[in-house]
Regions:
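Intrinsically disordered, low-complexity segments enriched in glycine/proline and serine/threonine
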Residues: 6, 10, 85, 125-127
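Exported/periplasmic ABC-transporter solute-binding proteins
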Residues: 35-67, 71-72, 76-82, 89-92, ...
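Sec/Tat signal peptide C-region and signal peptidase I cleavage site
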Residues: 30-34
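General helical structural elements
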Residues: 7-9, 23, 50, 81
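Bacterial N-terminal signal peptides that target proteins for export
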Residues: 2-21
């Protein structure tokens, strides 16, 4: 298909997914050799990317070369000139910002959802009815990710803002408590910054994190329990793809992630697929 004809067709498609589907399908048809795909991905997607490399790599004749970090930090690396074919972000904000800078090939595409969970020790007896009061209790140390550099922090701040709607002043108090813990954690060696280590060393009492990672944390530390944030307070995280180059292999990988098999991988890794995968 000639490029001009492709552009005309894209102009008549009304959704980002339609744009991506057509462009990725055309690129897949024209690809004749294996390529490496440089993937920048949110840390919460380690399992997904590993499964993609295992499942999609052989099927699509590609090699996935991943780099993990906070989505905001990864976006900044791209803005500074580092090469990546795909950004798999824990939000749509970073992909949209890259689009606004003219760095994307197609509009950002949502591919998964998540939930926020409150992690605490089972002995604390945290419930949906009392978790806000527990977080507000002066002695309780609450951990979140850092906003801006990591969408997990932005989602936690959004949760605090939602709490503030019915409890004025609570949002600022919770942000202050979380910021204090962040400042303390920043002084630690990177290897010891994980939530499990912070709970083990009794440096935190509660953590706001993605529910997709709570099962692994509870497996490592059976004394911990996770509680899904009530739906009316949850900011409902949405994950997005930024396709940054016309690398045919990258486009095939992005399309695979949106396929039934890709959405099945999303579900298997404890995230919420946008579409119910066929089993």
């Amino acid at each position: 298909m000639a490029k001009s004809r492709l552009n005309i067709l894209l102009g008549h498609l009304g959704t980002p997914l339609a744009h991506a589907t057509l462009l990725l399908a055309v690129s897949a048809a024209g690809s004749a050799r294996a390529d490496t795909v440089e993937v920048f991905a949110a840390g919460s997607l380690r399992g997904v990317v590993s499964a993609l490399a295992k499942e999609a790599g052989p099927a699509l004749n590609i090699e996935v070369n991943p780099s993990f970090g906070g989505s905001g930090t990864l976006r900044e690396r791209i803005e500074k000139g580092e090469k990546a074919d795909l950004l798999l972000s824990a939000d749509l904000g970073s992909p949209r910002k890259l689009e606004s800078q003219g760095r994307t090939v197609v509009p950002p595409i949502a591919f998964a959802r998540n939930r926020l969970c409150v992690i605490s020790r089972k002995s604390a007896g945290v419930t949906a009815a009392n978790f806000v009061d527990r977080m507000l209790s002066p002695p309780v140390r609450v951990k979140t990710s850092a906003p801006i550099v990591d969408p997990g922090g932005d989602y936690a701040w959004a949760l605090f803002d939602e709490i503030d709607r019915t409890r004025p002043g609570a949002g600022a108090m919770l942000k202050g408590k979380a910021q204090t813990v962040m400042n303390e954690v920043a002084a630690m060696a990177p290897a010891s910054q994980g939530a499990a280590a912070l709970f083990s060393s009794k440096q935190i009492d509660m953590s706001i994190a993605y529910c997709s990672g709570s099962a692994a944390l509870e497996k490592d530390m059976p004394e911990l329990a996770s509680l899904e944030v009530p739906a009316q307070l949850d900011p409902h995280p949405i994950y997005g793809i930024a396709v940054l180059t016309s690398n045919p292999a990258a486009m095939r990988l992005a399309l695979f992630l949106l396929s039934d098999k890709g959405q099945e991988i999303i579900a298997d890794e404890n995230l919420i697929p946008l579409l119910e995968p066929r089993r």
